Amino acid sequence: MAKGQSLQDPFLNALRRERVPVSVYLVNGIKLQGTIESFDQFVVLLRNTVSQMVYKHAISTVVPARNVRVGPGGGYVHSGSDTLQINDDEVE
């Protein structure tokens, strides 16, 4: 697994599993909202009234509507915060 995906996959999987509503901001500024149905290495399937396949290279930011527990040892991803806390390590 690539080092860049060691946080990405558990984060997206937690959002998918818990059906957390998300706002997805694209690099062109467009905001999409819905829940993550599925994802792979290249795309995220976002569901609202319809399903949209969004290419990851077009995504700037994914903002969950509520806090999400990530991984078995699990810290939380705090929505609306500039600090991401995972497994007691802080990344700003």
UniProtKB/Swiss-Prot annotation:
CDD domains: Hfq (cd01716). The keyword Transferase does not apply. One of its GO terms (cellular component) is cytosol. InterPro entries: Hfq, LSM_dom_sf, Sm. PROSITE patterns: SM. The keyword RNA-binding applies. Keywords: RNA-binding, Stress response. Residues 9-68 form the Sm domain. GO terms for biological process: regulation of DNA-templated transcription; regulation of RNA stability; regulation of translation, ncRNA-mediated. This is RNA-binding protein Hfq. RNA chaperone that binds small regulatory RNA (sRNAs) and mRNAs to facilitate mRNA translational regulation in response to envelope stress, environmental stress and changes in metabolite concentrations. Also binds with high specificity to tRNAs. It comes from Xylella fastidiosa (strain Temecula1 / ATCC 700964). Pfam families: Hfq. Belongs to the Hfq family. PANTHER family: RNA-BINDING PROTEIN HFQ (PTHR34772:SF1). One of its GO terms (molecular function) is RNA binding. Homohexamer.
